[in-house]
C-alpha cells in the first residue's frame, strides 16, 4: 500500500528542487522531516508541507503506521514556464523565464 501527495505549479525551478529531493529519497518519514527542517533552502519548506500531507494521507486514508513509513519516490517535474521580458538599452528586451515545478512524494510502509 502506498500513499502519495502532489503539489503542482510551485514557483521554484525543478533543478533547485531536485537538490532537496535527493536528500530525502529512500529515508524514513521522520528522518526526512528532520533533514528538511535543517536544510536552508526554499524547496525544503515546500517539501515539509508535502511530506506532512503525505503522512496524513497515509494515516487517515490507508490506516498506516507513521513510524514505518519510508519515502519511496520523490518526483520533481517541470511545470509551465512564465515568460517575462526585461527592458534593456536601445530598445532591446531580454527574456526571463520564471520556471515552475510539479512536486510529488510517494510513501510506502516498510
From Swiss-Prot:
The keyword RNA-binding applies. PROSITE patterns: RIBOSOMAL_L22. Pfam families: Ribosomal_L22. GO terms for molecular function: rRNA binding; structural constituent of ribosome. Gene3D superfamilies: Ribosomal protein L22/L17. PANTHER family: CHLOROPLAST 50S RIBOSOMAL PROTEIN L22-RELATED (PTHR13501), LARGE RIBOSOMAL SUBUNIT PROTEIN UL22M (PTHR13501:SF8). This is Large ribosomal subunit protein uL22. It comes from Mycoplasma mobile (strain ATCC 43663 / 163K / NCTC 11711) (Mesomycoplasma mobile).
Amino acid at each position: 500500500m502506498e500513499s502519495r501527495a502532489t503539489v503542482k505549479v510551485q514557483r521554484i525551478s525543478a533543478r533547485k528542487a531536485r537538490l532537496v529531493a535527493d536528500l530525502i529519497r529512500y529515508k524514513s518519514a521522520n528522518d526526512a522531516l528532520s533533514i528538511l527542517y535543517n536544510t536552508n533552502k526554499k524547496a525544503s519548506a515546500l517539501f515539509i508541507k508535502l511530506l506532512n500531507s503525505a503522512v496524513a494521507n497515509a494515516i487517515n486514508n490507508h490506516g498506516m503506521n507513521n513510524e514505518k513509513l519510508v519515502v519511496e519516490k520523490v518526483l520533481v517535474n517541470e511545470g509551465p514556464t512564465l515568460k517575462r521580458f526585461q527592458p534593456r538599452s536601445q530598445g532591446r528586451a531580454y527574456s526571463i523565464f520564471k520556471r515552475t515545478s510539479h512536486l510529488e512524494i510517494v510513501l510506502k510502509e516498510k
